[in-house]
A protein has these predicted regions:
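DNA major-groove recognition helix of helix-turn-helix/homeodomain DNA-binding modules
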Residues: 25, 44-59
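Alpha-helical residues within the helix-turn-helix
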Residues: 11, 22, 51
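Residues that mark the N-terminal boundary/hinge immediately upstream of a DNA-recognition element
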Residues: 5, 16, 42-45, 56
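Short alpha-helical DNA-recognition segment
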Residues: 14-33
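Short, charged recognition helix plus adjacent turn
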Residues: 61-76
Length: 76
């Protein structure tokens, strides 16, 4: 599921795999392998993609069906 979400987010944002790979400072083929599920995506990349797409890491990982980012909580 996570791999499909990576592709869906990219396509929904009218981006090419090359665009996302450049944002993550990695080779295109490495990113392609993440989308195909051939290679496990590192935590740092999931965090960066969540920020980039304004969504949650849980959504990217398939742990949530809501693409909305988590609400920030105020500390006293």
């Amino acid at each position: 599921m996570m791999f499909q979400r990576l592709e869906d987010l990219r396509v929904d944002n009218d981006l090419r795999q090359r665009d996302v790979a450049e944002y993550l400072h990695m080779h295109l083929e490495v990113y392609r392998r993440y989308e195909k599920g051939i290679r496990e995506i590192p935590v740092w990349a999931v965090i960066q993609l969540a920020k980039y797409y304004h969504t949650s890491t849980d959504y990217i990982l398939g742990l949530s069906d809501s693409p909305e980012p988590p609400q920030k909580t105020r500390s006293k």
